[in-house]
A protein has these predicted regions:
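Transmembrane alpha-helices and adjacent helix-loop boundaries
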Residues: 1-152
Length: 152
């Protein structure tokens, strides 16, 4: 049995396929986390904004991508969306996992932002800070601290 394993994996150099698969898996995971974080933050900002159109777009994005199984999303991305472009399979997988991760990160970040007491925003505004200054200097640092355990 051991000799069969050695003949198959070592002599046949199939271990190289396993190492290549490991490298691809790590690349997909790393890129998906980066893409998901950026998309999640952007869509979370859209969800907490006062703009109804942006809110609706973010709501549709999160509802659709969180509601469709990931394997189905991979097939839709590869065979429907990116089929005419002929993109590399690895790139399509990175994008599919990234968009899926972004939908979940959106809700994590949104809950962290909305979990900050409204008094914090009022305090920043009363100090003369603009809405964006209040958000980035007061609310966001507290929200990051609140979402880190869930995000990691």
């Amino acid at each position: 049995m051991i000799q069969s394993f050695i003949d198959t994996m070592i002599s046949g150099q199939r271990y190289l396929l396993i190492l290549q698969g490991l490298g691809n898996t790590l690349l997909i995971a790393l890129c998906a986390v980066l893409i998901g974080t950026v998309l999640g933050f952007a869509f979370a900002l859209m969800k907490v904004s006062g703009n109804k159109v942006l809110k609706a777009i973010a709501e549709i994005y999160t509802t659709v991508l969180r509601g469709i199984p990931l394997a189905t999303q991979l097939m839709i991305f590869y065979f429907v969306i990116f089929a005419p472009l002929g993109l590399n399979r690895l790139l399509v997988a990175i994008l599919a996992y990234g968009f899926n991760s972004g939908a979940y990160c959106t809700e994590i970040f949104r809950s962290g932002i909305q979990g900050i007491d409204a008094g914090q925003t009022e305090a920043g505004r009363s100090l003369g800070l603009s809405q964006w200054q209040t958000f980035f200097k007061i609310v966001l640092p507290q929200a990051v601290k609140a979402v880190l355990p869930t995000y990691t």
